[in-house]
A protein has these predicted regions:
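RNase H-like two-metal-ion nuclease catalytic core shared by retroviral integrases
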Residues: 159-161, 169-212, 231-232, 253-254
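Basic, flexible linker segments flanking DNA-binding modules
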Residues: 1-98, 163, 173-182, 254-258
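Mobile genetic element proteins and their domesticated derivatives, centered on retroelements
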Residues: 23-26, 39, 55, 93, ...
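An active-site-proximal beta-strand-loop segment
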Residues: 92-127, 137
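C-terminal domain-tail junction helix/linker
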Residues: 185-187, 208-260
Length: 260
């Protein structure tokens, strides 16, 4: 007689039916807006103990897959050395709030809202706030708020060459309001080369994520409503795990860095 295999027919580490039901429920509720990381965070809140990759593998085995979209090939981005300490360099940029998010008086009176964003290059920890006018004065207001919000000293600030940040390309003599404040604080202001937004890649990427996870889903009647919703979104994004941070959130990495 031929000896039969003694190997188990089922993987002992395979997800249980109960775990699979939880994955399916979380996927249906959170994937479309928040992606795999949103699904994983929800499962962890419900006591799920397995790894992120294990969850994705199980979900795909169950037939839960993302919709594939054709992506145009991208040039290989230049890699820059990762910074080691919070505050070594903070990127700042402005995003115009999409017009199709406006409702009520904001839409009726043709208002425009603008989101200022600061992101710490080391930890990806962010601060955001919206204003109604795209002006240098609002950049200074944002900076003053930022200095109170970030729990570490900012050593350098990097921006593009927009007039809300610098007058370098429009005046040989006049200094922008932001530069006046930064000079008084002895914080260097780094300007990226003209027409090279990839040099501010981290804040640009964060704006794309804001579009995907926030603006594609929300509407606003007033500036106050926008800032209230932005506050909740900011808390979520600062606590969202990131593969680039070793499956940690900006809040987790920041706490580790400050405790070291």
């Amino acid at each position: 007689m031929v000896e039969r295999s003694h190997r188990p027919h089922l993987n002992p580490h395979r997800h249980t039916k109960k775990e699979e039901r939880k994955i399916k429920k979380a996927f249906e509720k959170y994937y479309e807006r928040y992606g795999w990381y949103g699904v994983y965070e929800e499962l962890k809140r419900k006591g799920y103990k397995r790894s992120f990759s294990g969850m994705v593998y199980a979900a795909k085995r169950m037939g839960l897959k993302e919709k594939r979209t054709k992506k145009s090939p991208r040039k290989q981005a230049r890699r820059y050395p990762e910074l080691l300490m919070p505050g070594e360099k903070v990127q700042i940029d402005v995003k115009e709030v999409p017009y199709n998010c406006l409702r009520g008086d904001a839409l009726k009176y043709g208002r425009r809202f603008y989101q200022w964003t600061a992101i710490d290059e080391c930890t990806r920890y962010r601060f955001v706030y919206a204003f109604e006018e795209h002006t240098p004065e609002n950049t200074v207001k944002f900076l003053k708020m930022l200095l109170k919000e970030f729990p570490f000293k900012i050593q350098k600030i990097q921006t593009d060459n927009g007039t809300e940040f610098t007058y370098k390309y429009i005046s040989d003599n006049e200094i922008s309001p932001l530069d006046k404040v930064l000079q008084a604080l002895k914080i260097p202001h780094i300007l990226i080369p003209p027409r090279t937004p990839w040099h501010n890649g981290k804040v640009e990427r964060s704006h794309r994520n804001d579009q995907r996870y926030f603006y594609n889903w929300e509407t606003f009647k007033t500036l106050d409503e926008l800032n209230e919703k932005l506050k909740k979104h900011l808390e979520w994004s600062n606590n969202k795990i990131m593969r680039t941070l070793g499956m940690k959130s900006p809040v987790q990495l920041l706490a580790e860095k400050l405790a070291a």
